[in-house]
Amino acid sequence: PESFYKKSISITKQRIVDAVNKMEEEGADFIDVGGMSTAPYLSTMVSEKIEMTRIVNAVKIIQRTTNLPISVDTCRAAVAKEALELGVDIINDVTGLKYDPSMPKIIEKYYPSLILCAYSKKIITGNQLLETRQLFKKSLEIAKSVKIPRTKIVLDPAIGFFRKKGKNSFFTKINSDWVKRDLLILENLRSIKLNMPLLVSVSNKSFIGEILKKENPSDRLAGSLAAEVVCVLNGANIIRTHNVAETKEAITTAQKIS
């Protein structure tokens, strides 16, 4: 309910069913579900119990609605454990397995596929491309230590999560302009991939609002589609989006032309 993009919120059973059916019909390859917003600029922290309840209830409904793989967006080990007990396929950790010390053990036990985001608990002051590569390498080392092969891992450069300041513990602090950081990363996706699949999430995000001077995320569709197309042309393998049909059509058209 705290998500920055209000149209993506589905609380009731019927709204979840409708949202999942719509995404599947529009061509989604998997469903990503979260129980707590981690947007750096919002005060959205909820208890582990609340996050877990939301995730468990949503996953059960989604599993009854579709056979698509399910990704759970959490950095809490206890929440991941409950989701994996239900048969969830993917854990999407915005902190790259670095926030909760118990997360690697849960990952080792259940052996899921992983989406690992670039993240540091310490401030990043150096070259953003090199630093992002290093953060990826550290997360890959953690995954390797619990016997998760690279073939089960996708990397995410955490667009929107590198900031000078924030209101939670899920972002990486930097001493430079966050919009410039995000644009630099998106311009140079191939240079940070480490020969790994790369997932990019730019849908309706703040940097688009900054570029277009559109404060309301719901007004950022055109900017989102442009950014998503460029991401794919620049080397992204997976796009996490709120707008499945529009995104697929834009990317399909761009790939044919390019």
Question: Language-model segments: which ranges?
Answer:
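His-Asp phosphorelay/catalytic-motif detector in bacterial-type signaling
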Residues: 66-67
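Active-site loop-to-helix "anion-binding N-cap" substructures in soluble metabolic enzymes
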Residues: 28-30, 74, 106
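Active-site-adjacent loop and "lid" segments of alpha/beta metabolic enzymes
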Residues: 3-22, 38-57, 61, 77, ...
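Catalytic domains of carbohydrate-active enzymes, especially glycoside hydrolases
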Residues: 18-34
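Short acidic capping loops at alpha-helix termini that bridge into adjacent secondary structure
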Residues: 149-152
